[in-house]
Structure formats: C-alpha cells, structure tokens
Amino acid sequence: MKKLHYFAIIIIAMLLTIVACSKIDDEDLNPVLEFVVIPDANFEKELVLQGIDSDGIVNQKILKSDAEKVEKLSLYSKGISSLTGIESFSNLKRLYADANSLKTIDLSSNVLLDTISLTSNNLTKIEGLERAKNLTWLSLSWNYFTEFTLDNDNVKNFLMDHNDLVSLEIKNAPKLESATLNINKISSLDFSNSLLLKTLIFSANRVKTIDLSNNVNLEYIYCSSNLFTEFDISKLPNLIDVRVDRNPTLNCIKIAPGQQIPTLKLSDYQTANINCN
C-alpha cells in the first residue's frame, strides 16, 4: 500500500513538472506583444498603407516592434490631427508631415531625427527639439507659432516664414547657415552667435535694427518691408545679394569703402554710403 502511495506521489510530481515545462515552452513560443496606441485613424491608415503596421488593420494600435523599424515617415496631406504614438518610433530619422492639421507635437523621444518638415499645419507648440542632436533641417513654415526658441547645436537650415511670430530667440544655433523668416511680426533678431550664417531672409516683419557685425560669412540678406531706421553691412565682406527696399524710414545703408555687392536692391529714396548720419 505504501509503495502504491509512493508511486502515486512520483507520478503526480512528474505530471506537474511536465505541465510547468509546457507553460514555459508556450511562453517562449508566444512572447507578450507590446503595442503602441495610435488614436488618429488617418495616421494609422497611412501606416497600414505603407506596410508599417503589420496587422493591416486600423484598430488604434500598432506593434512597438513595427514602430521601432521605421527610419523615415512621409505623411504629406493625410488629414492627420495627432501624431500621438510617434514617441515609440525611436529610430526615426526623417519626418515629413506637411499639410496636415497638427496643433502640437512632442518629439522628445525621437532623438535620432535629422530632418523635420511640418510646413502648413496648425502648430502652436513643438517640444523636444533640443534632444535631437542630429537635427540639421527644421521647417515649420505656414503655421501659427507666436513665439519660438531655437535651441539645437546642429541645425543648419531653419525655415519659419508665414507664422504669427512676435518673439524669436536664437538661444543656441552655432551651426546655423540659413534662416528664412518672411511674413511674421518679429521686432528684433539676434544671430550674433550663429557665426556660420550665410543666408538670412526676414522680409515683411517689424525689425527696426539688427547687429550683423559677427556674421561675416553672410552672402544673402533679404529684409524688405521692415521698419529699419539704420542698416549697417559694412563689416560683411562676402555679400552677394542684399535686398533692403521698402523700408520707409531707412534712407541710408552703410557700406565699407570700396565694398562691392553684386546685387543691392534699394528703393528710389535709399542710398548706400560709407557715412550715414
């Protein structure tokens, strides 16, 4: 009797071991899947169409592993109002989402981005740009920003024309080569720490004075239709094209003796002179 009891215990123990091992094997074969929430149906629809969302269904989620494979997103004019979920695209390098309906976006987790193009949205706020250490191209034109701070070590090209900008702070942009800021409401600009700047375009603003003495690499300056009372380009030896016409309170543009500027566009009431009093 004792022997039967003993064998019964052994058999039960063996069965429990087999069941436990079976569960472990099942877990190995069927790992827990992580999903990313994508609440915007138009965003997910495009992910499905581009073969990024592997389940092929618009169901407000994609696999995190799908998101992590993506290095480039092209989302031009897709009716997208939210890019919630983009934080899981941790290997994203290039984001093109022009002509949508975005109001805000947080790119704090997309630290590998080198190109961001969000032209023609409804943006008033963007977060996380200072974390994108590879960022060289930033286009935010045709949006609704009223203030903006550029704080990124590597940005070379910055486009922010056709906004409602009243305040623009260039806090940290040592590698900036080109800035386009046409048609805003900016009254002051300071690019004194952007020593590599070659192209500066800010026509149709409200700027009265600007100190460009540090920006000796400048080649192109377009600043028509501002409110300048003085304009000194005498310390900029590399200028190719300067357009400073339609500044009604600016009569004299200061240049250096012998300074040659191939294209200098002035209004008929303006002159370029070595002395402006």
Tell what function each PLM region has.
Residues 198-254:
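Ankyrin-repeat and related helical/solenoid repeat scaffolds used for protein-protein interactions
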Residues 70, 92, 102, 113, ...:
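Conserved hydrophobic position(s) of the canonical leucine-rich repeat
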Residues 47, 71-75, 95-97, 114-118, ...:
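Conserved hydrophobic beta-strand positions in leucine-rich repeat
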Residues 83-86, 105, 126-129, 148, ...:
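Canonical leucine-rich repeat
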Residues 2, 21-94, 249-277:
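N-terminal capping/linker segments that flank leucine-rich repeat
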Residues 78, 100, 121, 140-143, ...:
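Consensus "Asn ladder" position of solenoid repeat domains
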Residues 1-19:
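Sec-dependent bacterial lipoprotein signal peptides
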Residues 86, 94-145, 152:
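Right-handed parallel beta-helix
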